[in-house]
């Protein structure tokens, strides 16, 4: 995994602050592969309750996670009961690492 434990903790803290204690966060994409270089940070936040404004939540989470990653670009997917589940959500859960 190509983020530090401090960065992972900061991301978890921001996800909890913005999405609640029950939120689960997954790191996926190139950052889970130690042999990869560069790349943005891909996160999926999984929630048990409906999200009324998922785009706003994703944008807030992305901005806060980017700060924790020293300005690195962070893409955030939201998985919630009221949102369509896409193949990328399954990829994030099967190939990703839960933070």
Show which residues each predicted segment covers.
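Short, aliphatic-rich beta-strand segments
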Residues: 42-46
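Catalytic core of pol beta-like nucleotidyltransferases
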Residues: 1-24, 32-38, 48-99
């Amino acid at each position: 995994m190509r983020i530090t434990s401090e960065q992972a903790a900061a991301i978890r803290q921001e996800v909890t602050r913005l999405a609640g204690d029950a939120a689960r966060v997954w790191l996926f994409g190139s950052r889970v592969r130690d042999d990869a270089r560069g790349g943005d940070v891909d996160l999926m936040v999984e929630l048990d309750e409906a999200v009324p404004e998922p785009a706003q939540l994703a944008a807030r989470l992305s901005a806060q996670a980017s700060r924790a990653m020293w300005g690195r670009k962070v893409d955030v997917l939201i998985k919630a009961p009221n949102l369509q589940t896409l193949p990328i959500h399954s990829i994030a859960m099967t190939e990703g690492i839960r933070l």
